[in-house]
Amino acid sequence: MTRWTYTALAASIAFSIASPSVAFAKVKSTKKAAAPCVSESTMPALNVRALQTELMVAALSCGEAERYNAFVESRKDELLPYAKRLQATFKGRTNAFVTKVANNSSRNMDCVAAGSLFETVLSADHPQLETVASTDWASKRHGYRVCTKR
């Protein structure tokens, strides 16, 4: 071995002995962080936006642009208050929230299920969007929970 090799080896060993915490610093906690929370009155806005985003992703991924446009046009008066609530909650981060939901939707897109969802929201009996969106998949798409008081 050359003198340079011995020097590098000695420095490496000395560094390892002197700072054992470096070896452990990269170990991450196995505890999963709690999902962020919102007020109970805000949750329907998140769920409805998750529904709208699911349909938007289906429009792009499943060739459902015509039905998505029909949905937005027929439900714009119902969508608007939820959009305002979302903007009030997230302020300048609304686009980041919607992008996160869209990414989650695109990873799990099922065009057959999306087709059924379009049939539901465009049906003649016109169910409330809040009711349609109050399902487990909506909260899985946005990742929020209702805050609990301690």
Predicted feature locations:
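Sec/Tat signal peptide C-region and signal peptidase I cleavage site
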Residues: 19-25
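Short N-proximal segments of mature Sec-exported proteins
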Residues: 36-100
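Compact alpha-helical subdomains of small soluble proteins
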Residues: 76-150
